[in-house]
């Protein structure tokens, strides 16, 4: 169920129920089979609240919850996502943060993730500075995806764009970025990367990069 009211508040609600899943095991020597319960009855819930703000800004709250019958794994993840822009919409502060809580066989595993990104996104000269931190136990995978964990990253992006047309050029952009990653626990070096690029669009809208 989804909808948005006249004041710009959006609401989304999702619910699904999954039945039991079984696997059949067979002994190669005796040929005997055994039916094994691998997943119990599961209830999947999601709720999203999204509020439109002035200057094309917004703030959102998201919660996902998975409850499984018996001693199977339960999961709860709550998070916020926001994008705040000034009146001219050329500067921004955006980010997100979430907390996961996994419970399995009376063992609790809490984890967290947060991202903050500030920058300038219009004009000839644009930039942004981003910091991201993901704890070792952060786990949204019951109703989400996780590409990396136990990591913190700092990323700087800088670009200069020319929008004034010339005889052959429509617009062009030169960019530079630097990224520095460290593992959280233990605190050790993980990655360092530099990247440069150039994008060119001619008057016939042919692109080169």
Task: Give a label for each model feature.
Residues 2-67, 129, 152-154:
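Active-site cores of enzymes that catalyze phosphoryl transfer or operate on phosphate-rich substrates
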Residues 17, 38, 47-48, 59-62, ...:
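Weak global preference for isoleucine
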Residues 23, 29-35, 65-69, 102-104, ...:
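Extracellular loop and loop/strand-boundary signature of outer-membrane beta-barrel proteins
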Residues 43-102, 171-176:
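Surface-exposed extracellular loop regions of Gram-negative outer-membrane beta-barrel proteins
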């Amino acid at each position: 169920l989804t909808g948005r009211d006249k004041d710009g508040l959006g609401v989304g609600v999702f619910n699904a129920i999954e039945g039991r899943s079984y696997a059949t095991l067979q002994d190669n020597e005796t040929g005997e089979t055994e039916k094994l319960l691998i997943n119990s009855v599961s209830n999947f819930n999601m709720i999203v609240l999204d509020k439109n703000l002035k200057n094309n800004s917004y703030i959102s709250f998201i919660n996902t919850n998975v409850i499984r019958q018996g001693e199977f794994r339960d999961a709860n993840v709550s998070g916020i996502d926001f994008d705040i822009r000034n009146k001219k919409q050329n500067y921004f502060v955006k980010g997100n943060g979430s907390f996961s809580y996994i419970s399995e066989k009376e063992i609790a595993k809490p984890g967290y993730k947060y991202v903050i990104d500030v920058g300038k996104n219009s004009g000839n000269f644009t930039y942004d500075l981003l910091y991201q931190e993901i704890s070792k136990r952060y786990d949204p995978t019951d109703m989400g995806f996780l590409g990396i964990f136990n990591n913190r990253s700092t990323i700087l992006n800088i670009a200069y764009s020319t929008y004034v047309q010339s005889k052959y050029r429509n617009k062009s952009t030169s960019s530079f970025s630097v990224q520095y990653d460290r593992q959280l626990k233990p605190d050790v070096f993980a990655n360092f990367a530099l990247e440069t690029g150039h994008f060119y669009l001619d008057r016939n809208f042919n692109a080169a990069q």
